[in-house]
Amino acid sequence: MYKKEIFRDLDKKYNSHLYTGLLGFFMNQCHKRLENFSNNNKHFNKILEIGAGSAPHYSYIKHSYDEYHIAETSDYAEDFHKNNPKVKLIKYDGKKLPYEDETFDRIIISHCLEHILSPEEFIQEMMRKLNKGGILSISLPTDPGLAWRLGRLFIKFFTIKKTYNISGEEFNYMNATEHVNSIFNLISIIRFNYKGKFKEDFYPLKLKMSDINLFYNVHIHK
């Protein structure tokens, strides 16, 4: 969850901040739209979700599957899932996924890649863990696009004190240290490395412009 020690106690308030009200509506729609891909009616043997936190994606999945694995870095997320019979959780270092290559039919990473210091290398790491014909599903905020910045400004002045009990300055610092990768750089990395192998979806508008949307979903086929 949150990387900085001073924000660790906010892990417990993550869902009340992101999954309630208008923001919660958009977040839920983002999860639902991540299930819109060409072969989402097939059966997947093994699924891996990376960084599920306290808002796992499995409740949105439309297709059938046999096993649902979660790879996590935080103690809070580990405790959140430890008694869940639906998942097989493993804690890892945030860099190397502790699985054999070509293990999973689908890998899901929702609102995590913007936090990872070496995103290109981590995408390659995820692709190695996919079986041939597998799919990597990525969901991202369009930070620092214009629409996202306007939304963050609203949160800073009207909701962050109520939900997190932190100041606007602390909120700015939290975002500066958490969202270390811009949506523009991440999209460029994906488009350059996986030409002809991906399908994009912008939300809430369909125009492929980060500045006028809030979320970016992409599916990369191996």
Task: Describe each region flagged by the PLM.
Residues R8, K13-F25, Q29, L117-M127, ...:
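S-adenosyl-L-methionine-dependent methyltransferase catalytic module, highlighting the catalytic core
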Residues F25-F44:
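Conserved alpha-helix/loop element of class I SAM-dependent methyltransferases that forms part
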Residues H43-G53:
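Conserved class I S-adenosyl-L-methionine
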Residues K46, D66-E67, I135:
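Residues at the starts of beta-strands that form the adenosine-phosphate
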Residues G53-K96:
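Class I SAM-dependent methyltransferase SAM/SAH-binding core
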Residues K95-I107:
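A short acidic, Gly/Pro-enriched loop at the edge of an enzyme's catalytic core
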Residues R106-L117:
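A short SAM/SAH-binding and catalytic strip from SAM-dependent methyltransferases
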